[in-house]
Amino acid sequence: FLKMALRICGDYGYGYRMYTSADKRVCPKGTPYFLLKASTLLSRLWGKRYGVPMPDYLLFPDWSVPGMRDSYEAYKKHILTIWGNLPEGITETFVHPAVESDELKGITNAWQCRVWEYQLLKDPEMHQYLKDHGVELISYRELVKMKAKK
């Protein structure tokens, strides 16, 4: 499936949500590191073959970290610590931001996490923290342009 998806993305000039580099700091919890490295090798190989821009790393916030679900401030502190120690390159943070609603509460038990992810993206302190650490927020359109220059 990955190879076919990357070929189609290459045909249309789209980026793809996969990663091209492995780093233990951004290995999803429960994923053996060797599996991360193997998938990285395939995505890098096929992405290069078909000219598909992808982030270097894909970061999955781990909501099972003790204390992370206690409060928005605890969540924010944990995420900002991670973002302050990212590997060099382009990292996509995989989040599901959402506005609090009865519908959201009815479709997922993780509704509070999603609301906090939304709050974090609007938080001026977060924006200042990223600026202070040289982290720039970009879109996939900008990713495609950046990777095309390389």
Name each model-derived stretch:
Residues K3-K150:
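Terminal accessory/targeting
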